[in-house]
Design a protein with these regions (language model features):
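Non-catalytic interface/linker regions that flank or bridge core catalytic/transmembrane domains
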Residues: 1-229
Length: 229
């Protein structure tokens, strides 16, 4: 698509790029159409996302909406792209101060990227949860893969929600298992949530050291892309 893989574009589209306002609008539309609610707080009450995820979604949405409104005013037109010409001025309007060697425009874009990443995370979890609610598997019986993971229908699920905190190498192991089991669609919503919650606590070096075998040498590990969102 026109905005495909543009989350880290240097001039991203606040509305249409991955992790943008359109993603939030679409997932809320699906939620409302399926009868689960039309607000983040309502979705949290229905158990589709956690209260924390609801707060994060609201915060990221507010950041993107604020940037978009300021951008429209500054450009004098309906401009949704964070063009280079506007980045420094927007940063100044937001009261950002340069911290050499970082420019204010870099600080502005970091704020955008964090919001876009957060939107992608919440969106992914919510879409997976919606799919499971709308199309529930009939009497799905877990199939054990090892002590850390199991198959739950077409989803890879951690057997313990704290597995990634206890064993950092399990993050990369989950990517390898998705490569080894083509019948698995992706990590389950619960597993993604556990992985993302543990990620800030895990140093990349420690994660690599925790692996007892060179997992990254096996398969093309396309599933590792999910770790960055």
């Amino acid at each position: 698509g026109r905005y495909h893989d543009a989350t880290h574009n240097l001039e991203p589209n606040i509305k249409e790029s991955p992790g943008g306002l359109r993603d939030l609008q679409n997932v809320l539309w699906v939620s409302r159409a399926a009868g689960f609610g039309k607000s983040w707080s309502e979705l949290a009450r229905r158990g589709l996302i956690t209260p924390r995820e609801a707060r994060l979604a609201q915060r990221h949405q507010a950041i993107l909406q604020d940037l978009r409104i300021r951008l429209h005013y500054l450009a004098g037109r309906r401009e949704d792209r964070l063009l280079f010409d506007f980045q420094t001025t927007l940063a100044d309007e937001l009261g950002m101060s340069a911290k050499p060697p970082r420019r204010t425009s870099e600080m502005l874009m970091q704020r955008y990227y964090r919001a876009a990443k957060g939107v992608t995370q919440v969106n992914t979890i919510l879409l997976l949860t919606l799919e499971a609610r709308i199309f529930p598997g009939a009497n799905v019986v877990p199939v054990v893969i090892n002590e850390r993971f199991q198959k739950l229908g077409e989803w890879l699920e951690a057997t313990d929600e704290n597995v990634f905190r206890k064993e950092p190498g399990a993050i990369l192991e989950s990517a390898l298992l998705l490569e080894q089991h083509p019948d698995l669609k992706a990590r389950s919503a619960a597993t993604l949530r556990a992985m993302w919650q543990a990620a800030p606590l895990i140093d990349a070096v420690n994660c690599a050291i925790a692996l007892e075998r060179p997992l990254l040498l096996k398969g093309n590990n396309a599933s590792l892309v999910a770790l960055t969102y």
